[in-house]
């Protein structure tokens, strides 16, 4: 791995260098490194994580450069989410775009370790890495493999809002911890690393949700919540697990 780290140090330098070295030399070295590093290898995954450090320094400029890295590895491969990458580039190339402004706020105002975990789990695992596995599984099983899995940990809710199905149909339906854990483990085998919780109110089960975040630290979790069960203790736990 020492050689790999040295290569990645050169690679990161070339990708983000802004000095006076010949542009032609830099471009040729970039091409050489891209050619010799297989995009599915652990080395490339490590390199992209390393590149995250550069985003922290200047998100507006270096986020664009990071997408350039991904584009170089993806090439014209139809399995590498070309349409999604193009849509993302339109957003980051337009500073007046609302999504662009939201991303910059997240990068600048959110705890650094939380942003790092989101980068690794959402951008790398759920997209760059997971998508390739999903495509392989779609061909293997001749069926669709979802990009994300949505599940209801419980139908219970601490509120009784007029018109909401949770208030009308009761709160007796629950997935056990082991059932949710099994869904996530099976999903990861298919390349799925993004899980969305709805309900009911998912935070009725917040101890289980934190435990699942801790166990599946390579996944990204999103929860639709009414927010009333978020307290200081739970906020500290979310900061601790980061995903």
PLM feature spans:
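Core AdoMet radical
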Residues: 148, 167-175, 190-205, 213-230, ...
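Non-catalytic protein-protein interaction scaffold segments in large eukaryotic complex-forming proteins
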Residues: 22-62
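Short hydrophobic targeting helices and cationic amphipathic motifs
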Residues: 3, 8, 15-17
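Generic structural signal for well-ordered alpha-helices
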Residues: 184, 209-213, 235
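N-terminal accessory interaction module
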Residues: 58, 66-105
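N-terminal [4Fe-4S]-dependent radical SAM core
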Residues: 94-150
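Canonical Radical SAM [4Fe-4S] cluster-binding loop centered on the CxxxCxxC motif
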Residues: 142-144, 148-177
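Conserved N-terminal glycine/acidic-rich loop preference
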Residues: 123, 130-132, 137-145, 162-163, ...
């Amino acid at each position: 791995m020492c050689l790999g780290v040295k290569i990645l140090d050169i690679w990161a330098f070339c990708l983000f260098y802004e000095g006076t070295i010949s542009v032609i030399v830099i471009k040729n070295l970039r091409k050489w490194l891209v050619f010799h590093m297989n995009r599915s290898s652990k080395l490339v995954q490590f390199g992209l994580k390393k590149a995250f450090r550069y985003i922290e320094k200047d998100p507006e400029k270096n986020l664009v450069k990071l997408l350039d890295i991904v584009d170089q590895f993806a090439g014209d491969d139809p399995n590498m989410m070309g349409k999604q990458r193009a849509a993302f580039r339109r957003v980051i190339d337009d500073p007046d775009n609302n999504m662009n402004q939201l991303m910059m706020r997240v990068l600048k105002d959110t705890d650094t370790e939380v942003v790092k975990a989101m980068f690794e789990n959402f951008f790398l695992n759920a997209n760059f890495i997971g998508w390739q596995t999903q495509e392989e599984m779609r061909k293997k099983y001749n069926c669709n493999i979802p990009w994300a899995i949505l599940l209801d940990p419980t139908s219970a809710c601490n509120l009784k809002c007029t018109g909401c199905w949770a208030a009308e149909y009761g709160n007796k339906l629950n997935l056990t911890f082991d059932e949710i854990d099994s869904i996530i483990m099976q999903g990861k085998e298919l390349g799925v690393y993004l899980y969305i919780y709805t309900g009911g109110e998912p935070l009725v089960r917040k101890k289980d949700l934190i435990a699942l975040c801790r166990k599946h630290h390579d996944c990204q979790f999103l929860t639709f919540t009414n927010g009333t069960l978020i307290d200081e203790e739970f906020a500290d736990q979310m900061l601790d697990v980061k995903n």
